[in-house]
Regions:
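Hydrophobic face of amphipathic alpha-helices that form TPR/SEL1-like repeat modules
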Residues: 71-79, 106-113, 117, 127, ...
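Short coil/turn connectors between adjacent alpha-helices in alpha-solenoid helical repeat scaffolds
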Residues: 41-45, 76-85, 115-121, 149-157, ...
Length: 217
């Protein structure tokens, strides 16, 4: 796969992360027993922000709520696909400047695709890494994929899988699906393990991911 195709693949994943409504708060966890042992599984709770109208989000941003800023940036981004709105960038920047992990992840996306800013994959990676250091699930996924592709940083499969697994354990369905696929296919990346593949597919399927549901059908 050439660098252009790798970039498009990463962007597609990032777009799915935002457009798929994954910009939310993850917290709480329970223990899940499987044939291979006990896995820590985070319950995913959709933040109140995701159910708010644009006007409600604007009211929250006026109070300095950095999470609401990130969600509003995402909301406007989704509502005007194909058209660049400076407010999307301004909100993401303000949220990130207030040390909001979701805001950093959103700003990283904008630098990845060159939305209202010159495309800068290194800056995008740095933002993802900062957010990943605070265990932001989508950012952990983005960092993992960056290491796996080797496009922005030196390719490091071990690091990539580590971040991907952290994201999956945090409850991020995209990472759970990816791990399921890696275990199902096997190869140089990891040893084939159908049972583990089914476990990860099941976790992603439980959160409504169509691709995982298809693999289990």
């Amino acid at each position: 796969m050439n660098s252009k195709n790798v970039l498009l693949t990463i962007v597609a994943i990032l777009m799915a992360v935002v457009i798929g409504g994954e910009l939310c708060v993850y917290f709480g966890y329970d223990l899940y027993q499987s044939e291979n042992g006990i896995f820590l599984r985070h319950k995913v709770y959709i933040a109140t922000y995701q159910n708010m109208s644009e006007n409600e989000l604007r009211q929250r941003t006026e109070t300095g709520d950095a999470d609401a800023m990130a969600m509003l940036s995402c909301t406007i981004f989704n509502a005007h696909k194909g058209t660049e709105y400076k407010e999307v960038l301004e909100l993401a920047q303000k949220s990130a400047n207030n040390n909001c992990p979701s805001g950093k992840n959103m700003l990283g996306l904008l630098y990845t695709i060159g939305y209202c800013v010159p495309q800068n994959l290194q800056k995008a990676f740095d933002l993802y890494k900062d957010a990943a250091n605070e265990n932001e699930p989508a950012a952990l996924n983005n960092v993992g994929n960056a290491y796996l592709s080797g496009l922005v940083v030196e390719k490091d499969t071990i690091q990539g899988l580590m971040f991907l697994e952290k994201s999956a354990i945090e409850g991020f369905p995209t990472s759970q699906y990816q791990l399921g696929t890696l275990y199902y296919n096997g190869g140089k990346t990891m040893q084939k393990n159908v049972n583990k593949a089914i476990e990860w597919y099941t976790l992603a399927s439980d959160q409504g991911m169509p691709l995982a549901q298809y693999e289990l059908s």
